[in-house]
Amino acid sequence: MISVNDFKTGLTIEVDNGIWQVMEFQHVKPGKGAAFVRSKLRNLRTGAVQEKTFRAGEKVSKAHIENRRMQYLYASGDVHTFMDNETFEQLELSTAQIEHELKFLKENMEVHVISYQGETLGVEVPNTVELTVTETEPGIKGDTASGGTKPATLETGLTVQVPFFVNEGDVLVIDTRSGDYVSRA
């Protein structure tokens, strides 16, 4: 058991018969009344995000998540194959299980596969990934004065807003948490 006062971003807990990951939390001490913790939780099974309020000092069960380093091998229809780097055991996940992460996955990429009591919950990609621009409008001389952006399609099909100086074939660093352009690689 863990106290809600000890919440940290990324902590996994068991609440209401679900496995939840703490995305955000805030300790609130109103002028009148008892303190409480307002949190934003993501269900690791369904991906649903829910806001939940706990009384200060309330205890919740900590979920012991197994985190294995694996390599993304390939996709075959709606099935995506991963390989354990130590045992070379292969694992297949459906598109529905890793829908959000697919926008950032490239073949041979190292990821963390999360499981709870033998049930695979999903995939964690690195905080930033390097992806190649496959399609974007060419930058026109003089455009950069305004510091604007233009859409660019990346090798995984993800579309992001990028500065005007980015061209097709450029390798970009993308933040996987927000899906935003960070820099050129």
Curated annotation (Swiss-Prot):
SMART domains: EFP, Elong-fact-P_C. The keyword Amino-acid biosynthesis does not apply. Transmembrane segments: none annotated. Belongs to the elongation factor P family. Pathway: Protein biosynthesis; polypeptide chain elongation. The gene is efp. It is found in: Cytoplasm. One of its GO terms (cellular component) is cytoplasm. PROSITE patterns: EFP. The keyword Cytoplasm applies. Keywords: Cytoplasm, Elongation factor, Protein biosynthesis. This is Elongation factor P. Pfam families: EFP, EFP_N, Elong-fact-P_C. Involved in peptide bond synthesis. Stimulates efficient translation and peptide-bond synthesis on native or reconstituted 70S ribosomes in vitro. Probably functions indirectly by altering the affinity of the ribosome for aminoacyl-tRNA, thus increasing their reactivity as acceptors for peptidyl transferase. One of its GO terms (biological process) is peptide biosynthetic process. NCBIfam families: efp, PRK00529.1. GO terms for molecular function: translation elongation factor activity.
